[in-house]
C-alpha cells in the first residue's frame, strides 16, 4: 500500500473519531414551516413532453448486469413503436455501436400505455463515459452516462439515496437538492415508492408518465437502482386489476436474472466496492419462500475482500420510532435480522415512513421462548438502519413520533430531503443527510461509517445503551 493511501486511511480514522463523538440521541429541533404537500399540476414545466412526433420520453437507465459492465436503457414512445435500438459510443471513440431491445405495452383499467422500450447495452468498459441516442430521425434524443470503476476493495464511489419521491413541489425540491449537492452522487439507491399514481382515482397511470418525465433529468444520466414499495403494488380488484406490480414491472427493468435471482423484486449488484442487495417488503419472505431461499444462498456468496461494503435496500423499515407504519417491518426483521448480523451487513436503507431517521448499530436477535429477551441492544456486528422515506410525496410528512425517543435511535427529523453515501476505501465511508430547507452543501445529519468486515470499531454517535 502506498504512503498516500496509508495517509488517507489514518486521516479517515482520525476524522471518524472526531465526527462520531458520542452524544445523546437527537430528535431534531428544526421546525419546518407547515405547508400542504401537493402534486405539481399536469402542465408543469417538469412534465413537459419533448417536442416532435413520437419523440422518446421518460428515459431512464439502471445497471444491466451483476458487475457494472452493462446498462439497461428504457424509454417510452407515444405515437407508434418506432425503433427499439440504442446507438452508443465511448467519449474517446467515434465508432458507434448499436444495441437492440424490445417493446411492450400494457393496459390498466381505462388506460393504455405508450410503447415501452427496454434495451441492454453489454460489454461496456469500466470507468468510461458513453454517449447514447434513442429515437429516429428529427426526434432522436441524446444523453450520456459514466460506467463505474472496476469492482475492487478500495474503489471510492458515491451513492445518492432517495425514497418515496412522488411528484409534488417538495419532490422537485428534493431532486434539485440532490442534483446540486456538492457531494456528487454517481448512482441513486432508490428505496421504493416512485410515482404515487395509486393515490389518484382508478390508479391514474398518466401519473406514471408524468413521473417518468419529471425524473428524466437525472435517471437518463445516472443509474437509479430500483426497490419496489407499497405504492408500486397497484392491486385494485375493484376495477378489475388483480396483477400486483403491473405498471412498475412493465416500466422498470432490473438485472435480476444476471445474478440468478428468481424475481425482479429481489436481486444483487456489485458496484465499485459495494455489494447491494435489494429485497422486497411486499413479496412473500417467510421460510421456504423464493425470496427467503434466495437470500439464504446469496449472503454467503458475498466476498468482502472484493466488495467490502454490504448494503441492503428495502422499503418497510425494521427500526422505526415514528407512529406511522410502526412495527410494520417486524415479521421480516424476525426472519432475516440474524442473517444480517451473522454476515455483518454495514448499512440498511428503507423508506415508507415519510421522515428521516438513523439508528445506532443494534440487533434484537437474542429472544427465545425461555429468556424473554426482546429489546434492541447495541451490537457492533449489526447494520446501521436508515429511513430515507422523505422524498416529498403528496401524502406529506410523518410528524408523530414515539416518546421518549428509543435509545437505538441516533437522529430523527420530520423533514423532506435526501442523503449521500461517499465510500472512501474498504474501511471508511462518509454518510450525510440533507434537508430541503438548507443550502445545498449543508449536512443536517452525518457520520463516518466504519466497515464491519475490515474495520469493525465502534462508530456510534450516541451514548451507550
UniProtKB/Swiss-Prot annotation:
The active site is at residue 325. The keyword Cytoplasm does not apply. InterPro entries: Calcineurin-like_PHP_ApaH, Metallo-depent_PP-like, MPP_PAP, PPA-like, Purple_acid_Pase-like_N, Purple_acid_Pase_N, Purple_acid_PPase_C_dom. Keywords: Disulfide bond, Glycoprotein, Hydrolase, Iron, Metal-binding, Secreted, Signal, Zinc. It is found in: Secreted. It catalyses: a phosphate monoester + H2O = an alcohol + phosphate. One of its GO terms (molecular function) is metal ion binding. This is Purple acid phosphatase 2. It comes from Ipomoea batatas (Sweet potato).
Amino acid at each position: 500500500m502506498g504512503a498516500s493511501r496509508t495517509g488517507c486511511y489514518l486521516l479517515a480514522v482520525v476524522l471518524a473519531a472526531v465526527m462520531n463523538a458520542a452524544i445523546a440521541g437527537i430528535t431534531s429541533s428544526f421546525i419546518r414551516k407547515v405547508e400542504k404537500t401537493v402534486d405539481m399540476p399536469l402542465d408543469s414545466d417538469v412534465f413537459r413532453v419533448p417536442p416532435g412526433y413520437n419523440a422518446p420520453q421518460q428515459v431512464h437507465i439502471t445497471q444491466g448486469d451483476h458487475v457494472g459492465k452493462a446498462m439497461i436503457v428504457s424509454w417510452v414512445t407515444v405515437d407508434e413503436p418506432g425503433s427499439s435500438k440504442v446507438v452508443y459510443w465511448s467519449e474517446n471513440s467515434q465508432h458507434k455501436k448499436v444495441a437492440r431491445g424490445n417493446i411492450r405495452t400494457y393496459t390498466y383499467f381505462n388506460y393504455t400505455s405508450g410503447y415501452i422500450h427496454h434495451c441492454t447495452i453489454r460489454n461496456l468498459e469500466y470507468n468510461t463515459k458513453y454517449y447514447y441516442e434513442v429515437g429516429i430521425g428529427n426526434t432522436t434524443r441524446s444523453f450520456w452516462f459514466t460506467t463505474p470503476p472496476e469492482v475492487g476493495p478500495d474503489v471510492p464511489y458515491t451513492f445518492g439515496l432517495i425514497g418515496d419521491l412522488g411528484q409534488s413541489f417538495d419532490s422537485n425540491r428534493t431532486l434539485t437538492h440532490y442534483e446540486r449537492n456538492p457531494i456528487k452522487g454517481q448512482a441513486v439507491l432508490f428505496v421504493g415508492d416512485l410515482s404515487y399514481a395509486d393515490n389518484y382515482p382508478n390508479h391514474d397511470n398518466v401519473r406514471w408518465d408524468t413521473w417518468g418525465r419529471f425524473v428524466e433529468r437525472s435517471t437518463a444520466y445516472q443509474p437509479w437502482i430500483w426497490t419496489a414499495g407499497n405504492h408500486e403494488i397497484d392491486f385494485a380488484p375493484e376495477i378489475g386489476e388483480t396483477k400486483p406490480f403491473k405498471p412498475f414491472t412493465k416500466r422498470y427493468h432490473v438485472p435480476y436474472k444476471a445474478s440468478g435471482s428468481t424475481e425482479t423484486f429481489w436481486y444483487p449488484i456489485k458496484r465499485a466496492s459495494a455489494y447491494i442487495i435489494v429485497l422486497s417488503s411486499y413479496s412473500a419472505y417467510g421460510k421456504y419462500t423464493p425470496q427467503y431461499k434466495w437470500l439464504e444462498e446469496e449472503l454467503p456468496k458475498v466476498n468482502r475482500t472484493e466488495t467490502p461494503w454490504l448494503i441492503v435496500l428495502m422499503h418497510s423499515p425494521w427500526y422505526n420510532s415514528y407512529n406511522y407504519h410502526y412495527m410494520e417491518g417486524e415479521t421480516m426483521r424476525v426472519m432475516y435480522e440474524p442473517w444480517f448480523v451473522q454476515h455483518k451487513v454495514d448499512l440498511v436503507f428503507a423508506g415508507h415512513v415519510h421522515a428521516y431517521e438513523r439508528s445506532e448499530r443494534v440487533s434484537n436477535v437474542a429472544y427465545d421462548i425461555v429468556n424473554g429477551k426482546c429489546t434492541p441492544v447495541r451490537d457492533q456486528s449489526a447494520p446501521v438502519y436508515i429511513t430515507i422515506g422523505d422524498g416529498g410525496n403528496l401524502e406529506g410528512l410523518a410528524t408523530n413520533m414515539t416518546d421518549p425517543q428509543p435509545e437505538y435511535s441516533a437522529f430523527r427529523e420530520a423533514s423532506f430531503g435526501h442523503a449521500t453515501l461517499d465510500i472512501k476505501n474498504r474501511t471508511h465511508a462518509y454518510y450525510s443527510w440533507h434537508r430541503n430547507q438548507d443550502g445545498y452543501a449543508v449536512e443536517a445529519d452525518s457520520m463516518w461509517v466504519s466497515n464491519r468486515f475490515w474495520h469493525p470499531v465502534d462508530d456510534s454517535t450516541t451514548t451507550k445503551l
